[in-house]
Amino acid sequence: MKVITLTGYKAHELGIFSHNHRGITYIKKAFEQQILALIEEGVEWFLISGQLGVELWAAEVVIKLKQTHPHIQLAVLTPFLEQESQWQEASRKKYHDILEAADFVDSITKRPYEGPAQLRLKNEYLVQKSDGLLVLYDEDKPGSPSYYLEVAKKRQQQEPYDIRLITPHDLEWIAQEDEMNDSVDIDNL
């Protein structure tokens, strides 16, 4: 595997409405663990569509890891032009920072938003262009990642395609580990 698509829920689907929500830390840690494992397996490119939430947080992880793994690359393949036009200013700034740090940026349809067909095309395109999918997903709460998974599972039926899930259980484990580390630090003061 050389290319992996990173995705998951939009921030609002997770009930996250602030850029400093503690849950983002756990999501980033989970992605960092998985991305490091993927780098060890030979993955060089990480793809996102740039949607708010998990994709941008995962992109921040890739950008951070480029400091110690300079051979990895980030591509942002947006479903349409100006997808950030309706976002809040803080989100637009974070998005533009990621675009600046990315190694490749392009729009799949090269047109402004016209309809949901562009989003379906984005899912199909990113799955087609990658060797696997790393997705934050809860089977009890399908949400937007289910569209990626549907396309990925179809591809998996025809040829090898790696699908890796980060689950709520994984995040819970990271949060518990973090709390244990915090309590250990307090005890050592």
Curated annotation (Swiss-Prot):
InterPro entries, per database record: YspA
UniProt-listed SUPFAM superfamilies: MCP/YpsA-like
Similarity remark: Belongs to the UPF0398 family.
Record-given protein name: UPF0398 protein BH1768
Organism name: Halalkalibacterium halodurans (strain ATCC BAA-125 / DSM 18197 / FERM 7344 / JCM 9153 / C-125)
Lineage: Bacteria, Bacillati, Bacillota, Bacilli, Bacillales
